[in-house]
């Protein structure tokens, strides 16, 4: 609900920082993710559409914010100064030329990579047709475009997630759990004071979901093996449901 968030921020003079880390090329209501807020954050982690191996980028249209960010990433040194002037405390978060060159090549290949991954996700989704009673799958609403970061599956029955994980392991298909609810399922944020159960829907996704890769270098054989494994694991869930 970005319109509502931006409206509240404007009313109370707040800054909107968009977490666009895994949303390269994604759209919300026809508008690219990253265009809504005052600042947008992108990650160049190795699994993302554009990768530098590590690192990331912050984008903004505000020149003052850009100067502060550029200063902060370089030990707090005054941006564009030839002297060692430090008006603020900063960190060392500068990307080296080697990493940047890898990222620039990724930018030049962006849409080829994006479209190839979208194609693979579509194949995975087609393999899951008929199993909508078992799980929720990666979907797109009208006017929205998902970033093809991975193919997500969230089980509707808590007992099914282990079946899918075990079947994936059997055929050596790598999977990762869905991201847990930050305030209640990550120990690092326990000081926020929330107890398990405060965010039941988010916690369900964290406990009962997983995602698998859709890397653009997957071969036809790789994709076929994943589809076969998806069908087998979801079929086992359906059979258990009927017992």
Where are these regions (language model features)?
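Active-site PLP attachment segment
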Residues: 35-74, 97
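PLP-dependent aminotransferase class I/II
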Residues: 1-4, 11, 27, 63-243
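C-terminal EAL-domain catalytic cores of bacterial cyclic di-GMP phosphodiesterases
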Residues: 8-12, 16-18
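A short, conserved beta-strand element in the Rossmann-like catalytic core
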Residues: 15, 21, 217
């Amino acid at each position: 609900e970005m319109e509502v968030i931006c409206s509240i921020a404007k009313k109370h003079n707040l800054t909107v920082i968009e977490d666009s880390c895994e949303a390269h090329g994604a759209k919300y209501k026809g508008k690219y993710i990253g265009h809504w807020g005052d600042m947008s954050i992108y990650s160049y982690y190795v699994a993302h559409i554009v990768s530098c191996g590590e690192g990331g980028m912050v984008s903004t249209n505000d020149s003052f914010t850009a100067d502060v960010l550029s200063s902060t990433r370089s030990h707090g040194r005054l941006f564009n100064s030839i002297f060692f002037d430090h008006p603020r405390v900063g960190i060392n978060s500068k990307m080296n030329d080697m990493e940047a060159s890898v990222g620039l090549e990724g930018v030049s290949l962006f849409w080829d990579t994006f479209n190839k991954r979208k194609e693979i996700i579509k194949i995975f989704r087609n393999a899951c047709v008929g199993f909508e009673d078992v799980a929720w799958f990666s979907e797109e609403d009208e006017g929205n475009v998902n970033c093809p970061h991975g193919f997500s599956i969230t089980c509707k029955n808590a007992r099914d997630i282990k079946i899918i994980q075990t079947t994936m392991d059997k055929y050596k298909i790598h999977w990762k759990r869905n991201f847990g609810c930050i305030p209640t399922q990550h120990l690092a944020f326990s000081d926020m004071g929330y107890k398990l159960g405060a965010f039941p829907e988010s916690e369900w996704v964290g406990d009962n979901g997983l995602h698998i890769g859709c890397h653009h270098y997957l071969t036809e054989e790789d994709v076929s093996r994943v589809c076969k494994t998806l069908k087998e694991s979801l079929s086992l869930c359906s059979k258990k449901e009927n017992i």
